[in-house]
């Protein structure tokens, strides 16, 4: 290590006094001349750099010390480390490396135009070693796998109800502001066809007629509107169709439909007439759902006050009313060749009635222990139910079995529907989203017998093929399969060679 022995500190007064004044003057003159020469040289170098010339190499210049200015004796620290020390060399090397990294980053940023938010496109390259990894192979398979259902639809407004068109790949979405959005759906993309402004208040139910020619909507504004799907114009307006807000509609055929309001009134309508065919009020609370069977002789209504009420359409009077239940009856469906009616409740129970015997249920299934507000028949023996827990569950009717989870939402599910082929389910939640689930696998579902052993706990949590979640048992099954394949491999395991 070199030391600065040729420099004196201001405290060495005796030695400083011995210096010859002429020598001091000469040294000062030489320093001033060197400063002037270096200043001229630096200006020439920077002028050349500005003109595009390369920065000159100063390694061969013995007078160059790497500093922009000369330090005076006043700033000298006798305890400072020598610039020629190993530490200072490391610092300079580190500084140069950092500067190089900064320059490289700047050049990379300069690839984009000034002010542009465009980022360099990322490439996903896989070498042979990557492709042998199980996770990477699974990712590649997922990317290449074609979609089996349309992508999600997201709206700004709350979705109150959804309905599939009976003949075309169109789905209607009713909103809380009274509009209806018509989307054409496809596995690759969804297309908004048009938005129809139909009601001044929340549109609570939307239905297509059996032939798909007309779109029926009811609202909190107490009106029923019929829109022509071809002309997109209003076909008929039933103004003040009810004295209270209308909650639900049910289409019987191409001409007849029924409506139910918040006060328990049920009305039957004919599109060819201006007024209702008949009106019955046998309930005191909201009508939650209306339905019929294929013969359409009886009209059934569930209500929030815990009654199942049946009306004789031809006689225009009440047929029978069930015993009261201490829970809301929210939804229902017809199964087993129109021989069974199943009703879902606010306590998560499923009640079964023999057709025509609606006074009291013949069977009860505890269900999912979460409020059931929606139900749609998928096949003659399989129903999908949904509610506040955000899960769509499939269950087998008579005997009752939880088949598993069809799909999930992050929030409570508001509406549920199945398309005409029975292969696609759509659901909307409080998150203003519509999701699609391919349930074609139910076509090959086998018969369930009453005496078959089953695990109700596992069945309730089992994820079906349409679910976005996988089963833990599937993961361990894959591991078991890999172990079995390894055992069959003649190259695996210890050698039997003698």
UniProtKB/Swiss-Prot annotation:
Organism: Drosophila simulans (Fruit fly)
Keyword DNA-binding part of the UniProt annotation: no
Protein name: WD repeat-containing protein 55 homolog
Pfam families reported for this sequence: WDR55 (PF24796)
One biological process term in Gene Ontology: defense response to Gram-negative bacterium
InterPro entries given in the database record: WD40/YVTN_repeat-like_dom_sf, WD40_repeat_CS, WD40_repeat_dom_sf, WD40_rpt, WDR55_POC1
Region (Disordered): 1-131
Composition bias, Acidic residues: 12-23, 31-48
Family: Belongs to the WD repeat WDR55 family.
Gene3D superfamilies: YVTN repeat-like/Quinoprotein amine dehydrogenase (2.130.10.10)
SUPFAM superfamilies, per database record: WD40 repeat-like (SSF50978)
Repeat found in the keyword field: yes
Domain of life: Eukaryota
Keywords, ordered alphabetically: Repeat, WD repeat
WD repeats: 154-193, 198-237, 241-279, 282-321, 324-363, 408-447
């Amino acid at each position: 290590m070199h030391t600065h022995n040729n420099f004196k500190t201001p405290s060495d007064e005796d030695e400083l006094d011995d210096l010859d004044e002429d020598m001091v003057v000469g040294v000062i003159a030489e320093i001033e001349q060197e400063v002037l020469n270096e200043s001229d040289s630096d200006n020439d170098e920077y002028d050349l750099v500005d003109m595009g010339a390369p920065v000159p190499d100063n390694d061969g210049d013995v007078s160059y010390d790497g500093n922009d200015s000369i330090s005076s004796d006043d700033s000298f620290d006798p305890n400072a480390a020598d610039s020629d020390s190993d530490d200072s060399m490391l610092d300079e090397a580190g500084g140069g490396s950092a500067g190089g990294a900064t320059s490289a980053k700047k050049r990379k940023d300069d690839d984009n135009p000034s002010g542009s938010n465009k980022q360099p496109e990322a490439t996903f390259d896989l070498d042979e070693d990557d492709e042998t990894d199980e996770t990477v192979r699974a990712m590649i398979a997922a990317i290449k796998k074609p979609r089996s259902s349309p992508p999600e639809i997201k709206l700004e407004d709350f979705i109150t109800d959804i309905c599939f068109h009976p003949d075309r790949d169109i789905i209607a979405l009713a909103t809380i502001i009274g509009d209806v959005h018509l989307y054409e759906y496809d596995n690759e993309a969804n297309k908004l066809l048009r938005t129809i402004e139909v009601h001044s208040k929340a549109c609570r139910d939307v239905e297509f007629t059996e032939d798909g020619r007309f779109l029926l909507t009811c609202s909190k504004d107490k009106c029923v509107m019929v829109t022509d799907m071809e002309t997109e114009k209003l076909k008929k307006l039933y103004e003040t169709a009810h004295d209270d807000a209308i909650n639900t509609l049910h289409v019987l055929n191409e001409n007849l439909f029924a409506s139910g309001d918040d006060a328990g009134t049920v009305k039957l309508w004919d599109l060819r007439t201006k007024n209702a065919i008949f009106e019955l009020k046998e309930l005191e609370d909201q009508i939650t759902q209306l339905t019929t069977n294929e013969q359409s002789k009886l009209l059934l209504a569930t209500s929030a006050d815990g009654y199942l009420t049946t009306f004789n359409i031809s006689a225009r009077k009440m047929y029978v009313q069930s015993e009261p239940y201490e829970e809301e009856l929210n939804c229902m469906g017809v199964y087993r060749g129109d021989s069974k009616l199943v009703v879902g409740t606010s306590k998560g129970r499923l009640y079964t009635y023999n057709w025509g015997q609606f006074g009291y249920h013949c069977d009860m299934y505890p269900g999912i222990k979460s409020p059931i507000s929606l139900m749609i028949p998928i096949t003659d023996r399989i129903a999908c139910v949904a509610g506040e827990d955000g899960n769509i569950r499939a269950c087998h009717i008579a005997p009752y079995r939880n088949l598993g989870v069809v799909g999930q939402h992050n929030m409570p599910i508001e509406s549920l529907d199945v398309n005409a082929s029975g292969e696609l389910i759509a659901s909307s939640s409080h998150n203003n989203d519509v999701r699609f689930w391919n349930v074609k696998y139910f076509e090959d579902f086998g018969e369930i017998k009453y005496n078959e052993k089953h695990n109700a706990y596992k069945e309730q949590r089992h994820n079906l093929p349409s679910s976005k979640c996988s089963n833990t048992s599937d993961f361990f099954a894959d591991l078991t399969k890999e172990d079995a394949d390894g055992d069959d491999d003649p190259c695996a395991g210890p050698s039997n060679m003698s």
